[in-house]
C-alpha cells in the first residue's frame, strides 16, 4: 500500500470515523456508546496493518479492525429497528454505518495478498479509502444536511450519494460503463451536497472560521468530483484521462482533506454552537386538598 493511500486511510480510521459518529443524533442502540468511545483502540491495529509488510501479522491486525467495522455495520439494522424510518436522511446515515465494513473486508484481503472476488491488490487498496470517505463521510454529511434542510435538493443528495457509492461498487463486478453510471449518480449527489453546504454557509454559519471551512469543503468538492467523473469516463470510452495513481493523488487527497476534514470540522463547530433546547417544564401538580368542616345538620 502506497504512502499516500496509507496516510489517507490512517486519517479515516483514527479521526474521520469517530468524529463522524459523534455528530449523529437519534436513538442509540445497545453498544453504540461503547463502540464509539473505543473506536480509536480498534483503529490502532488497523493503522499498524497499513504500514507493516503484507504478512500473517498484518492480516490479523487488519482482521481486528474489520471486526470493529462489522460491529458498526450491525448498528444499522439496530438503529432501523428503533427509528422505523427510511426517510432520505436516515438512509444516508444507515449507509454511512455500513460502508466501513466494505473497507475493512478489502483491507484484510489486500494485506493477505488475496485477490478478493478477482480484484487486483491495487483496486482493493483503493477500496479502503473510498469506503471511509465516499461511503462513510460523504453519506454522513449528506444525511446531516438533509436533517438540517429537508427540501428536494437535500433529499436528492441523501439518496443519490449512497446510491452512487453502491453503483460504483457494482460497477467493479460488471464493466466500466456500469462504473461510469455510478460515478455520474455519485457526482450529481455530491454536487447537491456542495450546493447545500454553500447555502448552509450563508444561512447557518455565523463565525468566519466555520464559514471558511464550509466554503472550502464545497468548492473542493466541485473540482474533485469532476476528476473522478473524468477518470470513469476515460476508463469507459478510452478518452485521455489521468491514470489511477494521479486520480488517487488529486481526487482522493482533495476529497479527504479538502472536503471531508473541512466539512466534519464545520459541522462539529455548528453542533457546538447549536442552542441547547430549554428543559421541558415540570408537570403541574394538583394543589393539596384542604379539609372542609362538615356542614350536615345533626339528626
Range-by-range predicted roles:
Residues 1-281, 289, 294-299:
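Hydrophobic alpha-helical transmembrane segments of multi-pass integral membrane proteins
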Amino acid at each position: 500500500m502506497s504512502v499516500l493511500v496509507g496516510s489517507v486511510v490512517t486519517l479515516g480510521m483514527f479521526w474521520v470515523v469517530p468524529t463522524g459518529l459523534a455528530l449523529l443524533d437519534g436513538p442509540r442502540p445497545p453498544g453504540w456508546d461503547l463502540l464509539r468511545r473505543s473506536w480509536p483502540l480498534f483503529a490502532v491495529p488497523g493503522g499498524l496493518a497499513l504500514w507493516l509488510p503484507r504478512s500473517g501479522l498484518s492480516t490479523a491486525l487488519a482482521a481486528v479492525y474489520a471486526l470493529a467495522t462489522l460491529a458498526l455495520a450491525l448498528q444499522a439494522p439496530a438503529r432501523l429497528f428503533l427509528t422505523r424510518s427510511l426517510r432520505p436522511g436516515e438512509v444516508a446515515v444507515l449507509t454511512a454505518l455500513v460502508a466501513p465494513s466494505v473497507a475493512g473486508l478489502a483491507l484484510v484481503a489486500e494485506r493477505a495478498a488475496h485477490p478478493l472476488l478477482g480484484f487486483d491488490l491495487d483496486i482493493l487498496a483503493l477500496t479502503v479509502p473510498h469506503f471511509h470517505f465516499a461511503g462513510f463521510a460523504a453519506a454522513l454529511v449528506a444525511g446531516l444536511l438533509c436533517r438540517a434542510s429537508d427540501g428536494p435538493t437535500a433529499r436528492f443528495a441523501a439518496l443519490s450519494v449512497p446510491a452512487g457509492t453502491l453503483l460504483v461498487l457494482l460497477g467493479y463486478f460488471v464493466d466500466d460503463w456500469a462504473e461510469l453510471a455510478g460515478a455520474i449518480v455519485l457526482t450529481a449527489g455530491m454536487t447537491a451536497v456542495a450546493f447545500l453546504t454553500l447555502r448552509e454557509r450563508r444561512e447557518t454559519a455565523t463565525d468566519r472560521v466555520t464559514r471558511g471551512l464550509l466554503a472550502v469543503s464545497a468548492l473542493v468538492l466541485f473540482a474533485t468530483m469532476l476528476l473522478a467523473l473524468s477518470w470513469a469516463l476515460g476508463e469507459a470510452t478510452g478518452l485521455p484521462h489521468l491514470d489511477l495513481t494521479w486520480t488517487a493523488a488529486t481526487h482522493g487527497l482533495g476529497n479527504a482533506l479538502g472536503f471531508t476534514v473541512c466539512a466534519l470540522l464545520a459541522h462539529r463547530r455548528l453542533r457546538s454552537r447549536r442552542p441547547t433546547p430549554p428543559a421541558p417544564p415540570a408537570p403541574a401538580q394538583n394543589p393539596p386538598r384542604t379539609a372542609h368542616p362538615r356542614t350536615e345538620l345533626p339528626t
